[in-house]
A protein has these predicted regions:
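Active-site neighborhoods and metal-handling regions in enzymes and metal-associated proteins
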Residues: 1-437
Length: 437
């Protein structure tokens, strides 16, 4: 546990906290809770995915951890406090070793680490001194929770009920602004994830052939990721033939047929930092003339969208650029007429038959990472770039996607060493010999 969390080093997490507390109002404290361990069936539980804000600020992944930041506290020892689970020999027998206080300090750089059982008393004394409280919540625009209150929401409800006369603020806006701009250490973690994704894709490209099942392709990715200390960044999409027209197809149980394409939206995560990749490759190792025609159109759209990425660009304007580029390609392919393009309403009804999603999203500790959607892009943002064309009547969906860093001078692909052009894909797949005759 400690080795994974400490990969960035305590100085990075200390820097993150310094930037966040600088934006708090005077006499304010902020509280961040880890995520719940969620049940499955019977006595089973899901693997804990740490609260990304807590990890960003501390590097600690362990369940039930709480961070309190109070930069204006009268006593210096109260300005940063990390609460971790109480030591339990019985728990160690069943679940293994948990963090000691010294290990939590080594990972996070926080000098004062306390047992969770002491939280209520210490927090009450801090609240007697504080005037404003920053509470955290998942404010991602597409977040949807049906299982009841999250740990953060339960804490917020209880805190407001017990201390109704305090002022309360939203921590999420500060966290989203800070997390959007990646530090050099964070970018290096994402580069490592991209490198592992590259190695896995190269392995898979030489493995795919007619008769292979989508689940076997998933297993090849899993072997490469897990063997090298990574994991899937998200549930993999391995979609052969018409399955590629379902945007988030995850059954991954169909057989790849000769002459079809298979869309691979699969990427690695390392030390909680994610990458995101999509390639669409020919099952038989060679594109048909029609497949190549459409593939190259998507590739040109990718290049145009990639070149448009730069500081100052706003997400909604980037989407407009993508829509205009893809509309032109669809007209050139004979799939739309100029009259259909011109007569569309604001909902882009004609375009949406073939391209119906955004052109990219922020990525980092979350795959669909936090960002302020109306904010201009800045150097240090890491985005995906993923135009596509889906043609249901031809049983074909082609999407191309890289993880891309925004710099002062424009976009830099962190996956530039992963083949994307149609000829490069065919060359990579042919390295195992002529198997398509």
């Amino acid at each position: 546990m400690a080795s994974l969390s400490s990969s960035l080093g305590a100085t990075v997490f200390t820097s993150h906290r310094t930037r966040v507390v600088a934006q708090l109002e005077p006499r304010s404290l902020a509280v961040v809770n880890n995520n719940d361990v969620l049940p499955t069936n019977a006595d089973g539980t899901l693997v804990l995915h740490p609260n990304s804000d807590l990890f960003y600020l501390t590097g600690v992944e362990q369940e039930e951890t709480i961070l309190v930041l109070f930069p204006d506290a009268h006593e210096e020892r109260n300005r940063e406090i990390l609460f971790i689970r109480d030591h339990s020999p019985l728990l160690e027998i069943w679940e293994g070793k948990k963090l000691s206080k010294s290990e939590a300090t080594m990972i996070s750089g926080i000098k004062r680490v306390e047992a969770l059982s002491s939280f209520a008393g210490i927090f009450h004394s801090l609240m007697c001194e504080a005037g404003t409280v920053y509470l955290n919540a998942n404010e991602h625009p597409r977040a949807h929770v049906e299982i009841g209150f999250t740990r953060e929401a339960r804490f917020a409800k209880d805190c407001i009920a017990k201390y109704p006369l305090h002022e309360y603020r939203r921590l999420a806006r500060i966290m989203y602004r800070e997390r959007a701009v990646k530090s050099s250490g964070e970018i290096e973690m994402i580069r490592l994830a991209c490198g592992l994704t590259r190695d896995a894709f190269n392995r898979v490209a030489k493995f795919v052939k007619p008769g292979v099942n989508e689940r076997q392709i998933q297993a090849e990715f899993a072997h490469e990721f897990i063997s090298n200390g990574g994991k899937f960044a998200y549930t993999p999409i391995i979609a052969a033939g018409e399955n590629a027209c379902a945007l988030h197809y995850i059954r991954n149980d169909s057989t790849c047929q000769a002459g079809d394409l298979v869309l691979l939206d699969v990427a690695a995560s390392i030390h909680n930092y994610n990458s995101d990749l999509t390639r669409t490759i020919p099952v038989s190792g060679r594109f048909s003339s029609r497949q190549k025609q459409i593939y190259d159109a998507v590739y040109r759209a990718y290049r145009a969208c990639f070149m448009a990425l730069k500081p100052g660009l706003i997400a909604k304007d980037w989407k407009v650029i993508a829509q205009q580029v893809i509309e032109k390609e669809l007209v050139d392919l004979g799939l739309l007429t100029m009259e259909e393009v011109r007569s569309q309403g604001p909902g882009k009804e004609a375009l949406s038959k073939y391209f119906m999603h955004g052109v990219g999203h922020s990525i980092g500790l979350d795959v669909h990472d936090v960002q302020l959607v109306d904010a201009p892009m800045q150097p240090g943002w890491v985005m995906t770039c993923e135009p596509a064309i889906y043609i249901r009547e031809e049983r074909m969906g082609i999407r191309l996607e890289d993880t891309v860093l925004v710099t002062e001078h424009g976009a830099v692909s962190l996956m530039a060493d992963i083949p994307m052009e149609s000829d490069s894909i065919e060359d990579l797949m042919s390295e195992t010999g002529a198997r398509w005759a």
